[in-house]
């Protein structure tokens, strides 16, 4: 809720997807807020199985440093602004350090920080483009066959075997 006034100030230029998880009280507060501010375009969801789709439709995600959410954001090319209201929790610190060191990801500790980040990006689109480019440099495209070969090699090492990856489905056996 603390970030909504910042977004509202830019209602003519931004929109938001708000996900509340299973927090029904927050969901009701946001429904009420949205009713009072029809000029701001926002999509509101409780718990969602569609986060992967919502990330693909987003230019940025503001989130805590949960590893799963951050990995999904990276996979779907959606830069992260880390919500550090109350600080970075110990279980979030490695994820935060990875994205801070690797992509110079932004961290916000209050609505003022968010206003500065959003204002800079809106006033200087090249700044957002650079943030996104840095973020995308953290990605790598993995060839699934490479992973399979590495797993087979690891299995061979443990089992002291010499197996090789086989095509799937296996070729039809000829007449005997």
Q: What residue spans do the PLM features occupy?
A:
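Donor-nucleotide binding loops and adjacent catalytic segments primarily
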Residues: 1-57
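Hydrophobic/aromatic beta-strand patches that form the interior of the parallel beta-sheet core
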Residues: 17, 45, 60-62, 81, ...
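Short, ordered loop/turn segments at secondary-structure junctions
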Residues: 22, 85-87, 110-112
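A donor-sugar binding/catalytic signature common to diverse glycosyltransferases
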Residues: 51-92
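Acidic, glycine-centered active-site loop in nucleotide-sugar glycosyltransferases
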Residues: 76, 94-104
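C-terminal "capping" alpha-helix adjacent to the active site of nucleotide-linked donor transferases
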Residues: 100-127
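C-terminal amphipathic helix plus adjacent low-complexity
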Residues: 125-176
């Amino acid at each position: 809720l603390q970030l909504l006034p910042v977004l509202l100030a830019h209602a003519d230029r931004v929109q938001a997807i708000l996900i509340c998880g299973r927090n029904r009280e927050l969901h009701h507060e946001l429904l009420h807020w949205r009713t009072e501010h029809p000029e701001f375009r926002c999509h509101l969801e409780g718990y969602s199985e569609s986060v992967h789709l919502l990330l693909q439709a987003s230019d940025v995600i503001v989130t805590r440093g949960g590893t799963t959410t951050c990995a999904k954001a990276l996979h779907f090319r959606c830069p992260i602004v880390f919500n550090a209201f109350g600080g970075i929790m110990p279980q979030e610190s490695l994820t935060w350090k990875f994205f801070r060191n690797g992509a110079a990801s932004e961290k916000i500790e209050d609505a003022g920080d968010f206003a500065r980040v959003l204002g800079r990006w809106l006033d200087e689109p090249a700044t957002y483009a650079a943030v996104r480019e840095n973020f995308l440099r953290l990605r790598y495209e993995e060839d699934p066959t490479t992973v399979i070969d590495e797993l087979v090699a690891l299995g061979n090492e443990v089992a002291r075997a010499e197996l090789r990856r086989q095509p799937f489905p296996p070729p039809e056996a000829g007449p005997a």
